[in-house]
Amino acid sequence: MYDSPNADMGYDIRDYEKIMSEFGTMEDFDTLLREIHKRDIKLVMDLAVNHSSDEHAWFIESRKSLDNPCRDYYIWRDGKNGKEPNNWSSFFTPSAWSYDEKNRTMVPASVQ
């Protein structure tokens, strides 16, 4: 439901404060919330906070330099002998890592 380029079924969130256009607008969401509260219904939303999209503002910032304040928001690792830093796998990709050309280092695949 959160704004996402939808590379991994919407878990790659681009903006945690926006609604994905396929689901409507923030005004639509506000209306939904008002209407369900009138009926004494609560809304529980799933939220993946352990990763984001490579289009998220923090990730874009983190790539700018090694000393960027957002750099530590993500896990960056050097590969080993031209390969991934470890053998972790991913649900969405064979490896949990992908190579970031700009930084010449590895970043978890869920971000890329």
What are these language model-derived features?
Residues 1-112:
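Acidic/aromatic-lined carbohydrate-recognition and catalytic surfaces
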